[in-house]
From Swiss-Prot:
One of its GO terms (biological process) is proton motive force-driven plasma membrane ATP synthesis. It comes from the Archaea. This is A-type ATP synthase subunit F. It comes from Methanococcus vannielii (strain ATCC 35089 / DSM 1224 / JCM 13029 / OCM 148 / SB). Keywords: ATP synthesis, Cell membrane, Hydrogen ion transport, Ion transport, Membrane, Transport. The gene is atpF.
Length: 99
């Protein structure tokens, strides 16, 4: 299983330096959607990481993806949300609510 990444230039450089090879540097929501779809259709990819800000612009693409997509903060910090998507993923997968 490999990890795919969709992010801006700073995120892409960071993950490449960490040794990941399936890294897409995007500049628009359209590019991000296309990259997510390509990674989602790649049988070797098991997890996709993107930034919260990119995720905000491609919510429908993320909702339709078959793979697990984790949104991480970018260099500007986290987006304050009413519901934490990671907590929702864990609750749905494990059945336990994280406090």
């Amino acid at each position: 299983m490999r990890i795919g990444v969709v992010g801006d230039s700073d995120v892409a450089v960071g993950f490449r330096l960490a040794g990941l090879t399936d890294v897409y540097e995007v500049k628009s929501p359209e590019q991000a959607s296309k990259a997510i779809e390509e990674l989602d259709n790649n049988a070797e990819i098991g997890l996709i990481i993107t930034t919260e800000r990119i995720g905000e612009g491609i919510r429908e693409t993320i909702a339709n993806a078959k793979k697990v997509i984790v949104e991480v903060p970018d260099k500007n910090g986290p987006i304050v949300r009413e519901k934490d998507p990671v907590k929702i993923l864990v609750r749905n997968a494990v059945g336990i609510d994280i406090k």
